[in-house]
Every structure is written in structure tokens, then in C-alpha cells.
Design a protein with these regions (language model features):
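Flexible loop/turn segments at secondary-structure boundaries
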Residues: 45, 52, 96, 141-145, ...
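Metal-dependent nuclease catalytic cores in nucleic-acid-processing enzymes
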Residues: 113-124
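Conserved ABC ATPase signature
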Residues: 87-115
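C-terminal lobe/lid and adjacent interdomain/linker elements of RecA-like ASCE P-loop ATPase modules
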Residues: 149-223
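Walker B catalytic acidic pair
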Residues: 137-139
């Protein structure tokens, strides 16, 4: 009797269930279409990311190719690693980037190339959300230790002039070839003769903080 009771109860539960509804083919096709669109959008996003990354690397490379102070890394390819957010150099004919590029001077040049390339890329794609200017604080840091009346060697002077020339040529490229605008604000320890005597026409000295004159006027903190 127990077994019969269990069977009867199970049968009654089956009868109480909702009847199986036929498949709504129209709705099914609609959902399948939405799924396909989402999958295609994902592919499009990945393609856009790939294209934008290549464009960024090309802009960085254009600036890097103008340098003459990295002879050991001539013909290397610049590659922005978006997973680690760093710029790397890939030797010609190789697949993997260098782990280290040596001196502070080399990293300073890579720093300049990245940010100039980034702004160039954003100008190329017509973005409007990032202002077209850079603030650069003392690119001469690798060559000056901070002592007063300090002089640097000829090799370091050549490298620093190379960095200034890169900034100057970038402004010319954006304003002349791209027909756009850009501005660089630079606070620098090196003397102004670097640009006044080397035809860096896009440089303009706003003020000099020498002989006791500072960014904050002395009469403010002497009161």
C-alpha cells in the first residue's frame, strides 16, 4: 500500500504541473539575434582596441625615431604594454622587449616619447576630452645633481639638447603638419642658451628664477 500511495502522489503532482508550452520561435529568433549582435560587438571592441594600440605605438615610434642620443637602441621598436602600463623597447627582429634600458637619461627620453606620442595619437583620432598641453618638470634631471653653478659634460649637453629639440620639433609638427594647436610648459634647471643659441624657435622664456628670485616672490614669505 505504501508503494501504491507514493505512485499515486507522484502522479497527482505531475497532473498539477503547468502544461509544457510550445516554443515561441519568434521570441527565440529575436534572442538569438541579440546574442549574435553582442558577440559581434565584442569582436568590434577588440578590433578597435587593437587598432588604437597600433596607432599609439606608431605615434610614439615617430617621436622616438627623431632621437640621436640612443645609438645603442637605434632601430628598436617602441611598444606600449597596456597590461603593465609601461613603454618598452623591442630589439629589431625579436619578439620580446628588453627588461631594462639602462640609465635615467634613456628612461627620460622614453618618458618624453610616450607622452608626446600619446597626445599625437589623441589629436589624430580627434578626441576632445584631454587638453592639448603638457607640463614637463626638468628633463635635465639625469644630468644635473642640483649643486649650485653646476656644469655638465659635452656628452650630457648633447643629450639634453636632443631632448629639447624633440620638444621643439613636436610643436612644429602639430602646428604645421597637423594644423592644430599644442603647448608645452617646462620648468627647467638648464640655462636658456640651450634654446636661444640653437634655433629652437618654439621655446619662449617666460621668467628666470635666479639670483634669489623664486617661483614664490620673496616678499611673500619674508613678511
Amino acid at each position: 500500500f505504501i508503494i501504491i500511495g507514493e505512485i499515486k502522489n507522484a502522479y497527482e503532482q505531475i497532473l498539477k504541473r503547468d502544461k509544457i508550452k510550445p516554443i515561441d520561435t519568434v521570441r527565440l529568433n529575436q534572442l538569438n539575434g541579440e546574442k549574435s549582435n553582442l558577440e559581434n560587438n565584442l569582436k568590434d571592441i577588440e578590433q578597435v582596441k587593437f587598432t588604437m594600440k597600433n596607432s599609439l605605438n606608431q605615434c610614439i615610434q615617430r617621436n622616438y625615431n627623431q632621437l640621436s642620443s640612443l645609438p645603442a637602441y637605434k632601430n628598436y621598436q617602441t611598444q606600449f604594454n597596456d597590461s603593465e602600463m609601461i613603454l618598452q623597447l623591442v630589439p629589431e627582429g625579436q619578439l620580446f622587449p628588453l627588461e631594462n634600458v639602462g640609465s635615467k637619461s634613456n628612461y627620460m627620453f622614453m618618458h618624453l616619447c610616450f607622452y608626446l606620442g600619446l597626445h599625437e595619437h589623441m589629436i589624430n583620432v580627434g578626441q576632445i576630452h584631454v587638453p592639448q598641453f603638457l607640463f614637463i618638470d626638468q628633463p635635465s634631471i639625469p644630468y644635473y645633481t642640483g649643486t649650485s653653478n653646476e656644469k655638465i659634460g659635452n656628452d650630457d649637453k648633447t643629450k639634453l639638447l636632443d631632448a629639447f629639440s624633440l620638444l621643439n620639433s613636436f610643436i612644429s609638427y602639430i602646428t604645421t603638419e597637423k594644423k592644430d594647436s599644442f603647448q608645452i610648459f617646462m620648468v627647467e634647471h638648464a640655462p636658456k642658451e640651450y634654446w636661444t643659441e640653437n634655433n629652437l624657435t618654439n621655446f619662449y622664456t617666460v621668467d628666470e628664477f635666479i639670483n634669489g628670485k623664486g617661483l614664490i616672490p620673496s616678499d611673500i614669505y619674508n613678511e
